[in-house]
């Protein structure tokens, strides 16, 4: 993601559901600019536990999602927001399902935003989330160092500094020289519900 989004002149989208894939694919067809569509193989056929929501009824033939428009997956309860007991999670692709796994037990306290489009970004939706909750967690599959979300974190902290109650946190893959071929080691490398839950606990204590 960090490589593609730095190539001038192209748009980058990353759907997390079958319906979003169709809507963004049609938007890419109609867009005069080159569009790169990323797909996470872990979401194919939704065979992995926790990714069932990526399956969806096929939308109508004219279903198009505007590129650059994020999707709210889960919302927080107004009471929790008013009491300062809520936070917002911003992610995309498979990160949506890792986040949903981590959110179990925090019903009504977390709002989950699926970016869907990495370039252009939905800055309005992200800034609204910052002002609404004051605590933000970014989830990405990229390694922590030099990842796509670092740029988003810097921009959000600059634009919403007076509204934040805690530093913006990022969850990503473990920094390693290479991705292991062993499936168990690969799972240990990637983000998961537990690693995200640790950051949720940390932010909610602020």
Model features per residue range: what roles?
Residues 37:
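Non-catalytic, usually N-terminal nucleic-acid engagement modules in DNA/RNA processing proteins
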Residues 1-31, 173, 199, 204:
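Conserved thiamine diphosphate
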Residues 41-42, 46-206:
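Thiamine diphosphate
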Residues 8-9, 32-33, 107, 134:
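Residue-level detector of structured alpha->beta connecting loops
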């Amino acid at each position: 993601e960090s490589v593609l989004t730095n190539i001038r002149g192209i748009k980058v989208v990353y759907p997390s559901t079958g319906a979003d894939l169709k809507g963004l694919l049609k938007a890419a067809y109609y867009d005069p600019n080159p569009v790169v569509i990323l797909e996470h193989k872990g979401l194919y056929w939704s065979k992995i536990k926790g990714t069932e929501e990526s399956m969806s009824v096929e939308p109508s033939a004219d279903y198009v999602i505007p590129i650059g428009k994020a999707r709210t997956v889960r919302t927080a309860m107004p009471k929790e927001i008013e009491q300062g007991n809520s936070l917002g999670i911003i992610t995309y692709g498979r990160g949506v399902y890792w986040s949903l796994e981590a959110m179990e037990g925090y019903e009504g306290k977390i709002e989950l935003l699926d970016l869907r489009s990495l370039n252009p970004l939905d800055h309005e939706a992200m800034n609204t989330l910052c002002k609404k909750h004051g605590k933000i967690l970014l989830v990405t599959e990229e390694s922590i160092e030099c990842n796509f979300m670092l740029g988003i974190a810097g921009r959000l902290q600059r634009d919403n500094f007076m509204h934040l109650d805690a530093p913006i946190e990022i969850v990503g893959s473990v920094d390693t020289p290479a991705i292991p071929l062993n499936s168990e080691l690969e799972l240990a490398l990637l983000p998961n519900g537990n690693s995200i839950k640790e950051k949720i606990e940390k932010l909610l204590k602020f």
